[in-house]
């Protein structure tokens, strides 16, 4: 894998609060190699290591995107949801930003069935078919459509399992991570000082609670994906 320059700036990361971890009582000892100090009861992440792993992750997604691979971004907590959606849309990635439904990837046949029903309901709504139904029936279908849009809206164009999954907050998205591990899908995880770095293929030690930190990491990754996609389009 060719290493590239991704303009990862330590000062920029400090301004975004990427280096702030959790309280020293809430930590995973396996994160010790990624922690540089303690300050006022808080662990401080070693940003040099963060930059190294973020650069490695950018190289990986660039190479994958340049070969036409597909990505899924997962981040369902309130602080991450909007950033996940906007980053994914910008890079034409699939995303889950409300709730990971158990078995979404390991029970892919069920997910496919749900997606097909979601597509059918969208078509019926666009054709105005709901207005021709009894009010009660139309209301039921509208509720189903709204439910699907909330939980499956970010993956409505998925036709198969993703090639790489980017996860924001390992602990919050533990079910999604375990499903990826089970299926052998490579993962890039934003991990705070209370996480297990060994669970991800590429862990990126960073503050997973600050919106600015989440947005900065995502912006670097999707920028690399967009560049990779451009390379893929030019080579076709």
UniProtKB/Swiss-Prot annotation:
GO terms under biological process: translation
Family, as annotated: Belongs to the universal ribosomal protein uS2 family.
Native species: Nymphaea alba
Keywords in alphabetical order: Chloroplast, Plastid, Ribonucleoprotein, Ribosomal protein
SUPFAM superfamilies the UniProt entry points to: Ribosomal protein S2 (SSF52313)
Disulfide cysteine pairs (residue numbers): none
Lineage, opening ranks: Eukaryota, Viridiplantae, Streptophyta, Embryophyta, Tracheophyta
GO cellular component: chloroplast; mitochondrial small ribosomal subunit
Location of this chain's protein in the cell: Plastid, Chloroplast
GO MF annotation: an example: structural constituent of ribosome
Gene3D superfamilies named in the record: Glucose-6-phosphate isomerase like protein, domain 1, Helix hairpin bin
Pfam families: Ribosomal_S2 (PF00318)
Full protein name: Small ribosomal subunit protein uS2c
């Amino acid at each position: 894998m060719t290493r590239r320059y991704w303009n990862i700036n330590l000062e920029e990361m400090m301004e975004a609060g990427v280096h702030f971890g959790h309280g020293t009582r809430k930590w995973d000892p396996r994160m010790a190699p990624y922690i540089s100090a303690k300050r006022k009861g808080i662990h401080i992440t070693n940003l040099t290591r963060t930059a190294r792993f973020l650069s490695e992750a950018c190289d990986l997604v660039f190479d994958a995107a340049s070969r036409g691979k597909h990505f899924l971004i997962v981040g369902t907590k309130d602080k991450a949801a909007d950033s996940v959606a906007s980053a994914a849309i910008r890079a034409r990635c699939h995303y889950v930003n409300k709730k990971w439904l158990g078995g979404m990837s390991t029970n892919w046949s069920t997910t496919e069935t749900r997606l097909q029903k979601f597509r059918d309901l969208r078509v019926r709504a666009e054709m105005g078919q709901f207005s021709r139904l009894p009010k009660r029936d139309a209301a039921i279908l509208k509720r189903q459509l709204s439910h699907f849009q909330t939980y499956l809206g970010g993956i409505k164009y998925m036709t198969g399992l993703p090639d790489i999954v980017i996860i924001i907050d390992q602990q919050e998205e533990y079910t999604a991570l375990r499903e990826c591990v089970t299926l052998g899908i490579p993962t890039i995880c934003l991990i705070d000082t209370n996480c297990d770095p060994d669970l991800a293929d590429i862990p990126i030690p960073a503050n997973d609670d600050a919106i600015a930190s989440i947005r900065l990491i995502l912006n670097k990754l999707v920028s690399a994906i967009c560049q990779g996609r451009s390379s893929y389009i030019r080579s076709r």
